[in-house]
Amino acid sequence: MKSLLRKWNGMMIIALVISLLTPAWGKASAQSLGQESGGVQPQSAGVTDDVYVLSRDGTFRLPVGHINVNVDAPPQKTNYVALFTSGAQVTNSQETDKVFVKKTNTAIAVDKHDQVIRVIGPTAVPPTGSTWEENQNLPIPEGGYVLLANDSSWGTSVTRKPLFEHYKTGDTVSLHKGGQVVHAGDFLNPDPGLNLVTASGTTVTSPDFTVSGQVVRYGSGQGISLTVNGTEAALKADGAFQSAVRLTAGTNAISVKLLKDGREIVSSTVTVTYNDAQQPADLIEVEAAPIDITISIEGPAHAIGYVDQDIAGIDDTVALFTNDWGPQITVPQFNVAVQVDAGSKVTKVVNPSIDGKTPAWTGPTDLEIPSGGYVLVAQDTSYAGKNIKKYLATYFKVGDAIKLRKNGFAVPVKDLMGTGGPIARVTLDNYAMYTETKPSTELSGTITNMDDPSKIALTVNGTPLPFGPDGKFKTSYTLAEGINYLDLVVTKEGKEQDSKDLVVYSRPGFSTGKKVILWVDQAANARKFQTGDNVANFLRTAKENGVTSVVFDVKGVEGYVSYKKSTLTGRPYVSAIKAPEKAGSNPDLDLLQEFIRYSRELGLDIHVSFNIFAEGSIASNEFALLDSHLDWEERVYNAADNGQIKRLRESAKQGAVAFVNPSNDEVRDFQLKTIEEVLQNYDVDGVVLDRARYDNESADFSDLTKAKFESFLGARGKQLQNWPDDVFTYAGNVRKDGPLIRDWWEFRSKTIKSFTSEVRQLTDRVKAEKGKKIEVSAYVGSWFESYYLNGVHWGSTEFRYDERLRMKDKSVYTPGYYESGYVKNLDFIMIGAYQTTAPEIEHYITLGNIVTNGEVPLYAGIALTNVQEPALQRDVFQAGLVNTHGLMLFDASQVNWPVAGAALRNLVYVRDYQLGISLPDSPDSFLEGSYYNTNLIENNIGVLTDTFGYSTGNSRFGVEAVVDSSGKVTSVPNKTQAMTWNWGKPDETNSVIPKGGFVVSTLDASGIRTKRQLVANAYETGDSVRAAALSGFLAYEGLRTSADSVTFRGKVDVLGPGKASVTVNGQEAALREDGTFQADTVIRPGANPVVIIVRVDGFKTNEKTVTIIGDEAAVKALKLDRGTYSMNKGESLRLAVTAEYSSSSTDVTGQAAYASLDPAVVSVDATGRITALREGSGTVQATYEGHTATARVSVTSGSTGGGSDTGSGTGSGSGGGSAGGGGTAPSGPERTSVTETKDSDGRNLTLVSADAGVMEAEIAALQGKAAPVLSYEIPGEEPAGIVSLPGTALAKRFAGSPGAILSVSSHLGAIELPAGLLEADLPAVGSFDLLVQIGRTAADETADLRPGGERRHAGTRHAGCFPCFAENRRRNKRNRRLRKLRPKNRKLAGSGRPLTAPRRWSWTRPPECSASCPPASNRPGARRRPLSATEAGGPTRWSPPRSASPTLHPTGRARMSSCWPRSIVDGMGAGGFSPDEALTRAQFAALLTRALALDPAPAAADFTDIPGDAWYAGAVARRSGPARGRFRNRGVPTRRGADTRTDERDAHARREAGRYPDGGELRCRCAGALRGPGRNLRLGGRCRFAGGGSRPAGRTRGRTLRARPARLPVRKARPC
């Protein structure tokens, strides 16, 4: 993750989350500082009264919203920064000198010298529930102060996160007021303050209620008094008070006023709801054991609100559960429970308070209800602020004797139990809200606590459901399409015992074709793309992992754009951003154009997103245009501004983003122009509306909006009387709705809807002009129940609210508000499902389906920062995929592709690499890490290089070792803290990653020290450290093979500085520049351990042992029934998988494992059933015992039958290809089948088998074509591939099509075989197969691209080595190599008859391979032909070089020439060859020189009898002649002389090989020729003469003729 995402996550994660909160950039005001709940009385509020804390470097100001105010007193404050100063005696705890910091809040303590001495917050960033410091009381330093911050979302935090990140232990900071430096003492005030203990907002079931609290700084004689609802309350000496209030049914507002000399100085209101309908018939109380029996025999008592009733969703109550409820009760994690036995003794307390501290929350806990006893459960919304959970946690101890009271009298628990016996309960297995894609749903669960099942009945919507004696039930329930509300009720003898309701959205026939949309946020990603290649590689990786569409953020929140052609608005380009965490984009690269270019190449949809009503970043102080348009800025009405309406950036309460007014016509027009300039200048597929909303409920209250609201009201006969009070006002910090509040919600929502209508009109107009569809979509928060606060109804106008949806404010949903739904203006919608569990995501997805009424495709937006752990990510992804049209992944900077790719495919992620870090003090050991260049995951050790981002993002409680580009440790933050386990002053561990270096980063879960102490003890400043990742070994672990040897292939990625070396079983393996390596391993029967060790600059970083099993009975190959499938969208079929053994084959369909490599196109389940999801092509694979088979699936929308691949003429796809030259492959049988298997070396091999009938028809269709090519493709990236063709059919058809070309291609290259050439070597009779193989030998991959690895042969020079091309015929399971159809010494005179037309033979060289020797042209008279190759993306024609050089080109670019037979023996002039002429000695020497690839000498030879212009002059000059100065050229070479000359050239060739650094490693065919083919080049056997006779092999004195020896054999090399 980028630094931005660590330091300021709200700038990356779409700020839809802000709709859940009201951020509090507080400024000191009269209301917020004193008048609510006591505290300081400031001067009149204004800009000059701002109170803020300045960071150490003076660059960051944190505004303070509350000063010496009990923020937990009613009304409880949220989204604040609060200041508590020494001596003020006002805190939010029971102690006047300590501030209560609850878990999930942040705080700092500053001493009297302005130095930060303590920081409290998360132990990991981004924080999770388990990575926060526990609840605690933070002492206020003498003469200093404490700052406390609270908000509800870390991702968009403007209080907690800035306080935690900008103020560090040891920093010297300063406190300011009105621009002047102040100190804690400046905020002291002698006036008393009010500290209410009684919580506001509670619901009670008793009319008798007590308000309690304390007057701080109280003293007698001050003229201080206090009233509760107008009645004066008695004040104790310490200012404490209690006042009884009689409640009425419904909501009660209790006024508490503090007066001085009769003048009100502080007031507060406590809101309490009295629910008389749900109260017990009598007052039921529990009484704890006496605190001090010498003082009072009675203990503290508390009312019990519910007896044997489900209290889920009910705040602030104590409930009693008896045996009537059941045998046990489940206590939620943050509740408190007390177990009491039949003798009224406490036997267990769940989440007790130890020594007055906040409980260490555990659970959920299943707690037994003792026979004859009971369980008390307390739950509330604030442990510190409400005395409910705290009551049970504090006053109840194991062994205490307690009492139950009814109307004041002690009673046994049985007196509180019902008379009907045990109460039956129903528990459901179903989620409370979910989406169903079938026409029915399965309801299942259990009825518990039944004393007599015959008296129990279960119904769903009134229909009886059967259940078993054990209470279990399972039934299928038919659903209506759309929303279904299901009410399940359990009755006992007709009386309701329990009920549950379900909300199910039914989408029968819902498309299973899923899109995966990747969001590329501007702020987090723009500067990473410095070149077009960066974009291409990024998108290619995304596509390979299942992404189908991209959303590119072209207008960020700051107002800068990611495109260059801002022809209508003149918006500045993103490279103009100055904020360090975002700056650095390439000013010369049009990012949008690059994204479009490569998206088109890869077949990805490209949509562009706009932060519509966002025009600046308050957090980063970046405003592209807003400072020039202050009238655009939102005017807000916040409680913190003391009743004033202010410009957003002048308000005491600010968010991270500066919004503009959606009601301003100039604003709207400018945003539309921004969209239009992109649509006119760029080829995009759609527009995404992001932040097309108001900032929050406080906006917009400008005069312009007021006038438009008045017009809106006038149209419905209403009038605005008081502005803004008719909308709402504030009582303290609590919003009080006015009479026009519902009109206001509707007005704002219709304002946003009208803008989406204008966008729709714009895109439709551009569509008509361009003739191209442009989709409109929106990205919104999934929390629809509160999104009205942002002025947005993103649903359908047909949506209707139901109580069972349990939304907070049902009054919002008026007929007019329903009309404001804008989903019909969209083509699809993305909802931010930022929840972190599958049930939560299911809930909000279903709510989205309900609200949108299924009218447009809906995609679940997943915040990747919340789901980094692989198992959780998989669960969340699948929850989103099952019930929506797909996923939107936010954001690209957060993606860990291996994890995300597995999660998208619903596969368990298995880390396919070993991360290792050297240990300075243990040279033979290493530290094994977990992940590299991914967001830090708790309880793991990671390595982060500068490709990850600017900094690590670790928290202040992590441990890191920072390693620079030289490999030296420069710092180890928190080393001492971890080793001593003293975290009083933690270091900053969000370390900047050195360029060219890396950081070892770790963090344990809270309270665990294992990983942190491991890293802290391992490294110290000055150590030399290296790191690497080893991969490739997984494929070999447990591999069973019958091969004699296996080529082990792996890869090493060095992280940071250094050069790697690898050994495999003790033998050094050649390491290529890209980090790949290979080594041959001998396999013996049984277990064969293979040990791989990696060292970087000599430092050991990795060691891995895998075991390969040698087994003659192992599977040899795995086959699918087809290699390709053509299916209609929605069609399903089952794969059939066969395992082939040495002498048999077995159907393993039921045992194989399956996966789809393109899940958006085709899915496959665990049984092998594949389903076509959407048009396109995809690959499915089956795996069994280490072997894999793949098949290509082509999906169309056609209505014809599927199951075959007719070919497209492009040669694409698995086993694809087609008849060339316009020929079309007929429909019918499968054209090819594809099998993934192993070759004799244990390498992966792809076998493509052609169907005879289809092939014959295709060849027949070639007749008469201008370019008659029959092509086949070997799919995939395996090191070897074979195309198997039915030879009999091929020979028969090629006989009638002599001009046809057979073309076979793979990722390694391509080969073209003329029909006339093949015909000579194909048997005339009998059944056989032609096998055409393209592969890479182990030696090829070892030597390929090694410096100095130049090879020469046949008069040519080759850089590196090349793929092997082999042609065999197979008959009766035996293979026989065809006569040298290889790139050496091949002539077309094989059939004995001339070909009537020129033919071509070419090899297309892939970029990773270096050279090949193509066969000679079969055009008569052609001596050599340029090699056609492809390099760096474009075609290149290579001609033979004129001279040779022993140096390999550093990039591996081939310096090639031909290996034509006719370059070995030239003609005799005038176009003749003179085949019956005898060779002279000089000509024969030249023949050997060329055949052995020896460099010719300069033409000016020293031999006086050799003409300098003779074709053989340079070749002869390579060696001396028999006599000084003379070569005796006219002598006839004898067989003995030829043998002698061969030995001489052989020895010379061996010496020449030594000139090359890798000469000893050259084992491919090129190298075989170079290193002395000697024995096989000798002229043994019978030699046929022109006269037709022959001589025995032993004869040494025969003439050597020109024709036959020209086809010299070469030393045999291992087949491909």
Swiss-Prot record:
Residues 1406-1416 have a biased composition (Low complexity). Residues 1191-1244, 1372-1455, 1523-1554, 1585-1616 are annotated as: Disordered. Residues 1536-1554 have a biased composition (Basic and acidic residues). The gene is butB. Its main location: secreted. InterPro entries: Big_2, Divisome_Glycosyl_Hydrolase, GHL10, Glycoside_hydrolase_SF, Ig-like_fold, Invasin/intimin_cell_adhesion, SLH_dom. Residues 1115-1185 form the BIG2 domain. One of its GO terms (cellular component) is S-layer. SMART domains: BID_2. This is S-layer-related protein. Residues 1199-1225 have a biased composition (Gly residues). It is found in: Secreted, Cell wall, S-layer. It comes from Niallia circulans.
